[in-house]
């Protein structure tokens, strides 16, 4: 408040560990700044805010620990939830808390911030944070990474990395940081990146390791609007159950992903995994038949059960590399187009119900397969009256 009263500026916290057990509001025009000028890891130490704050009587719906008013920012700081897995809570059942950081107006920014461990990361969905800027976030949020919506326009999410090893690779001697191994939990409980009602959003060069949904598009809980047109460049989801999930989309939704790396790993308690999931069930009314997802120059690898599950809408793949495709591009509803792509998984016999590089289900409308290469030859299976067509179908 003193910095605000002086006309705004920077409140600098030198390297060290600070205990903060009550929410902090950073006023408009003020930056809360720590010792780091670059992205950093838990094991590097520096300026850190430790907390036991869990929302108090209102729990996870309580106020965020760090609240950024319009034009405020936080930079160069580590955050750590000390009691995430203590006092009756464990790595298998961690404590639920509010988001650690919340933007409460336009032009908020979060730069070079690391969440050593926390339940939820950054809330940019509860308010209109148009012009928000997030750059070089790292850490291991357990249930939510960055959630964006609220009608925000012209925001940037760039160069972030979420990975469970932030919770287990600590500075020399530990220095009071909680040591937690959260891989299995985040793979079954975390939604790392959520985008709802946003416009002209820049989503660039981000990486998520370990999550149910690596990047997730859905209807906005505040405005009731759907994702619009947006472009995602250089996104990576690794170790995920569903690397990219479109849960809600209307007729104007068009999501274009360029140079994506979408990876599944074999997760014992997640029996169904796919690189892409379009809609949560066959012919879901949450995804409009004309909603579009377009992927250019994608790398798919790992241990999928299905290469893609398409329940509604229109999904297009151009120049995709399916190192492994599982049971193929499974069009259960809606339409798919696959162009100039490479299916590298070898198959030992002719396609049956669960084999092949492409499947068209009983309620699937169509799949176009054109100019693709299949290492074991063109294999597909079809049920119902939908259409399989394209230059690959002789």
Model-derived regions: residue spans:
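Detector for repetitive beta-architecture
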Residues: 8-10, 15-17, 23, 29-31, ...
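Short glycine/acidic-rich loop motifs that flank beta-strands on beta-rich extracellular proteins
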Residues: 21-23, 42-45, 54, 62, ...
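Amphipathic alpha-helical repeat scaffolds
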Residues: 1-3, 191-192
């Amino acid at each position: 408040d003193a910095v605000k009263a002086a006309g705004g500026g920077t409140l600098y916290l030198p390297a060290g560990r600070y205990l903060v057990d009550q929410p902090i509001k950073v006023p408009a025009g003020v930056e809360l700044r720590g010792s780091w000028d670059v992205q950093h890891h838990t094991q590097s130490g520096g300026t850190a805010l430790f907390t036991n704050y869990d929302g108090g009587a209102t729990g996870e719906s309580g106020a965020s620990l760090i609240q950024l008013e319009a034009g405020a920012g936080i930079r160069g700081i580590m955050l750590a939830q000390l009691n995430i897995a203590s006092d009756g809570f464990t790595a298998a059942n961690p404590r639920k808390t509010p988001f650690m950081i919340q933007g409460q107006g336009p032009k908020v920014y979060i730069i070079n911030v690391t969440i050593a461990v926390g339940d939820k990361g950054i809330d940019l969905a509860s308010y209109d944070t148009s012009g928000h800027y997030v750059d070089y976030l790292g850490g291991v949020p357990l249930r939510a990474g960055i959630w964006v919506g609220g009608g925000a326009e012209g925001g940037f999410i760039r160069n972030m990395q979420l990975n469970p090893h932030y919770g287990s690779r600590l500075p020399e001697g530990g220095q009071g940081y909680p040591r937690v191994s959260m891989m299995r939990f985040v793979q079954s409980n975390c939604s790392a990146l959520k985008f709802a009602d946003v416009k002209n959003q820049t989503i660039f060069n981000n990486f998520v390791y370990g999550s149910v949904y690596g990047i997730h598009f859905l209807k906005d809980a505040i405005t009731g609007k759907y994702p619009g047109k947006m472009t995602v460049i250089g996104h990576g989801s690794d170790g995920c159950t569903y690397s990219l999930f479109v849960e809600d989309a209307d007729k104007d939704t068009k999501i274009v992903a360029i140079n994506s790396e979408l990876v599944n790993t074999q997760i014992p308690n997640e029996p169904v995994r796919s690189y892409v999931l379009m809609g949560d069930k066959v012919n879901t009314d949450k995804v409009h038949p004309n909603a579009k997802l377009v992927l250019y120059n994608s790398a798919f690898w790992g241990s999928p059960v299905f290469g893609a599950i398409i329940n509604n809408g229109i999904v297009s793949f151009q120049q995709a590399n399916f190192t492994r495709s599982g049971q193929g591009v499974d069009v259960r509803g809606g339409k798919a187009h696959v162009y100039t792509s490479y299916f590298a998984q070898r198959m030992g016999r002719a396609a049956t119900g669960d084999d092949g590089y492409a499947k068209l289900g009983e309620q699937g409308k169509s799949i176009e397969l054109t100019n693709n290469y299949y290492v074991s030859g063109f294999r597909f299976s079809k049920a119902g009256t939908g259409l399989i067509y394209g230059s690959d179908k002789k």
